[in-house]
Amino acid sequence: MSFNTEVQPGICMEPDAITQEYVFNHTMLRVKDPKRSLDFYSRVLGMRLLRRLDFEEGRFSLYFLAMTRGEEVPDAVDERQRYTFGRQSVLELTHNWGSESDDSQYHNGNQDPRGFGHICFSVPDLVAACERFETLGVNFVKPLDRGMKNVAFISDPDGYWVEIVQASLNGEMGRG
């Protein structure tokens, strides 16, 4: 089945053929305490750690996480590296060593000056997911019962917003 893009000013209707092989691989968030962040993204949201890379000379570590849904992830380092950088929808957490003990915070983009906004997870049952998040003590930025219907926002340990949606509830979203 071919994909027909929505028509909007600025959209290229026929991208170069070579781009058909491109993959949106990952987005990166800076984190202060990798233990807290890894716990949040693995225990609360179910992501798996694909790869950790340490850079002694730069004093930072990278953690690559994804939803694997039972996929076989290669054990061999070179194969795992290719798997990590060849798949879609990876979250990279970057930890600059020593940042966990300083008083500064990373800017989440949702206060002035605005910029980055959020990442999003789709869940099969929005109400059940939100009840589970409450039980786990997750911070809600926007609970289900406030504002726009059928969407919730939680925040991770660094204050980044995570949107939670249920695809089957959003067919009419944005249709006036």
Swiss-Prot record:
Residues reported in the UniProt entry to bind Ni(2+): H26, E92, H118, E163
Span of domain VOC: 23-167
Gene3D superfamilies: 2,3-Dihydroxybiphenyl 1,2-Dioxygenase, domain 1
Coiled-coil regions listed: none
Keywords: Lyase, Metal-binding, Nickel, Zinc
Binding sites annotated in the UniProt record for substrate: R30, N96, R114, H118
Enzyme category, top tier: lyase
UniProt-annotated catalytic positions: E163
Catalytic reaction annotation: (R)-S-lactoylglutathione = methylglyoxal + glutathione
Pfam families on file: Glyoxalase (PF00903)
Cofactor binding mode and count: Binds 1 nickel or zinc ion per subunit.
Keyword rRNA processing: no
GO terms under biological process: methylglyoxal catabolic process to D-lactate via S-lactoyl-glutathione
Co-factor(s): Ni(2+); Zn(2+)
E.C. number: 4.4.1.5
Pathway stated in the Swiss-Prot or TrEMBL entry: Secondary metabolite metabolism; methylglyoxal degradation; (R)-lactate from methylglyoxal: step 1/2
UniProt-recorded Gene Ontology molecular function terms: lactoylglutathione lyase activity; zinc ion binding
Record-stated family: Belongs to the glyoxalase I family.
NCBIfam families: glyox_I
Name of the protein: Lactoylglutathione lyase
Origin species: Pseudomonas aeruginosa (strain ATCC 15692 / DSM 22644 / CIP 104116 / JCM 14847 / LMG 12228 / 1C / PRS 101 / PAO1)
